[in-house]
Amino acid sequence: MSLMHRASRVLPAGGWSGAADHIALDYEARFLRRKRLVAASGAEFLVDLPEVTNLRGGEAFALEDGRLIEVRCGLEPVLVVTGDLTRLAWHVGNRHTPCQIEPDRLLIRDDHVLETMLRGLGARVERRMEPFRPESGAYGSGRTMGHDHGPFHVHA
């Protein structure tokens, strides 16, 4: 029986070099605390972080033996949205939907309900397989977690 190496730290993008391997994770899989993962080479390792972490592409898992496993954003189904981006971004944000904002397009996770809404607002929408890197949450959480604002938030 072989020993599974453990990663208990994540190094920030730009703060390391010399990855021994890499792993491509989609948006959901990049939100974790403890999980067994398999790197591109087939090597298994256990992620065992102190708290739930929102991983970003370019970061690295630091294995206990000193090796680094680079985190890459994996391909996943997204909607590429173009048109009046300010207006369209407002509607996407109003639904608390994670969104990757670029100068000439928005990317959201593939969702037929949002696709119908956006087309109804005049957007051009195309389905694609791309890495999804949405904006971090406004309050530092790194994730849009639905409509719950906590116990002291009320709508007027």
Swiss-Prot record:
Keywords: Chaperone, Cytoplasm, Nickel, Nickel insertion
InterPro entries: UreE, UreE_C_dom, UreE_N, UreE_N_sf
Ranges of Basic and acidic residues composition bias in the record: 145-156
Gene Ontology MF annotations: nickel cation binding; unfolded protein binding
Major location category of this protein: cytoplasm
Ranges annotated as spanning the membrane: none
Region described as Disordered: 133-156
Subcellular location: Cytoplasm
GO cellular component: cytoplasm
GO biological process: protein folding; protein-containing complex assembly; urea metabolic process
Top-rank lineage group of the source organism: Bacteria
Protein function: Involved in urease metallocenter assembly. Binds nickel. Probably functions as a nickel donor during metallocenter assembly.
Recorded family membership: Belongs to the UreE family.
HAMAP family associated with the record: UreE (MF_00822)
Protein name stated in the entry: Urease accessory protein UreE
Gene that this polypeptide is encoded by: ureE
